[in-house]
Swiss-Prot record:
Function in brief: This is one of the proteins that bind and probably mediate the attachment of the 5S RNA into the large ribosomal subunit, where it forms part of the central protuberance.
Keywords: Ribonucleoprotein, Ribosomal protein, RNA-binding, rRNA-binding
Organism for this UniProt entry: Erwinia tasmaniensis (strain DSM 17950 / CFBP 7177 / CIP 109463 / NCPPB 4357 / Et1/99)
Subunit structure: Part of the 50S ribosomal subunit; part of the 5S rRNA/L5/L18/L25 subcomplex. Contacts the 5S and 23S rRNAs.
Molecular functions (GO terms): 5S rRNA binding; structural constituent of ribosome
Gene name for this UniProt entry: rplR
Protein's name according to its UniProt entry: Large ribosomal subunit protein uL18
GO CC annotation terms, alphabetical: cytosolic large ribosomal subunit
GO terms classed as biological process: translation
Amino acid sequence: MDKKSARIRRATRARRKLKELGATRLVVHRTPRHIYAQVIAPNGSEVLVAASTVEKAIGEQLKYTGNKDAAAAVGKAVAERAIEKGITGVSFDRSGFQYHGRVQALADAAREAGLQF
């Protein structure tokens, strides 16, 4: 099993459990150059809020979009947008990525901005 298929297997298992809970989830996806975050409705069919380093407003503030500072900016932005829509509690879906580095920086920034998980 290669690295990508192992990550996808872990993500699928976690998403199955989150679906059983019926919780709104904060989904993170990372690439070497960018990081993306979305808040998805409990039914899984609707993206309620999204933020990423691809967005011009966030990308212009950063020197480089593939580091922990960029992840923290995305975490803060997604949390602020979620709170504006009345979403305060979510389940964190790390998409099979290790809870370390950029994924952890995004989660910590979202918590500091007021999102609870």
